[in-house]
Amino acid sequence: MPTPSSASQHVRTVLMLLLANVFWGLSFPLIKAIAFAHQQLLPASGSWLITTCTIAPRFILAAAILAVWQRGALLRLTRSEIRQSAGLALFASAGMLFQNDGLQFTSASTSAFLTQLYAIMIPVWVALRARRLPPAVVWASCGLVLAGVAVLGRFDWRELRLGRGELETLISSLFFMGQILWLERREFAGNRAMPVTFMMFVLEAAVFTALAGALLAGGAPRAAAMPVLFMSAPWLGFTLALTLFCTVGAFSLMNTWQPKITATEAGLIYCLEPVFASLMALVLPGLFSRWAGFTYPNETLTLNLLIGGGLITAANVLIQLKPLPKP
């Protein structure tokens, strides 16, 4: 029987991880709001430029905040920590590139639920790598996810295709799967979380700054026009919120509190991220629009969202309740 102190610690841990999921859920409508603000300020921007200009400031600021907050702990990174950071940054950068671009072509709620594909693909990958067939629970979860994807993405059965936003989100989820698998490699077990997170932020900032520079060099708008973003209070406000809450806050909470509970319980808590995203997308877009002066209507609880999101959430809960052993 747990002692009162251990029970209190467990409740606090669950609450902190729930808060991390609230922050991650907030990121979906926030990223769409940043895209609308950017398009309003620089109408000649393409979706890829908007994507890189959304992500680069986020990680530049996040790295700067961690550099001040954790300055003593960030010194003397080991070779293993640098290698882990590089792998995480590679997978995360690719995932965020497709996810953020896809968000410009689908709703925040749909993106949040489709991103959860990685929760199902990880046990499939583990089973295939071990050269064994996935167990029945994995097949059942895959069936639920495929049905949920078809409903959420309004899959066109005549042309056999998904929309651009839904397809890019599914691609991003595969890279996020790679990020999680890289994070869990046994060779990195002794690495320190905060220095690895800091270096990951630095590398992601460098990647997206370089991509933004390349896009600006190749077309409109000109680089000289970019300072208009930093003179916009709404764009700055959305970017600061994305950095403080959805980047530094969410990652710090996860790194601090997730080790205190089982992976199964943490996985179940993380299934709530798209639920929080959907709830916030019902009210925040209208508030963001009134402040920034663009048109971003509140989402509604459609039958597609309820059925598709419900199927994907059920699949994630099922796979977490019957987890596969680690390889």
What is the predicted role of each segment?
Residues 115, 128-151, 162-166, 286-314:
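Loop-to-transmembrane alpha-helix entry segments
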Residues 2-4, 55, 59, 154, ...:
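C-terminal-most transmembrane helix of multi-pass membrane proteins
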Residues 53-56, 60, 98-136, 171-173, ...:
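Specific alpha-helical transmembrane segments that line the substrate/conduction pathway
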Residues 32-45, 104, 153-163, 216-233, ...:
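Membrane-interface helix termini and inter-helical loops of multi-pass transporters
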Residues 1-53, 90, 94, 98, ...:
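Glycine-/small-residue-enriched transmembrane alpha-helix faces in small-molecule transporters
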Residues 11-16, 45-68, 140-147, 164-171, ...:
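Hydrophobic alpha-helical transmembrane segments of multi-pass integral membrane proteins
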Residues 22-25, 29, 60, 89, ...:
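Hydrophobic/small/kink-forming positions within alpha-helical transmembrane segments
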Residues 71-111, 151, 243-261:
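Specific transmembrane alpha-helical segments of multi-pass solute transporters/efflux pumps
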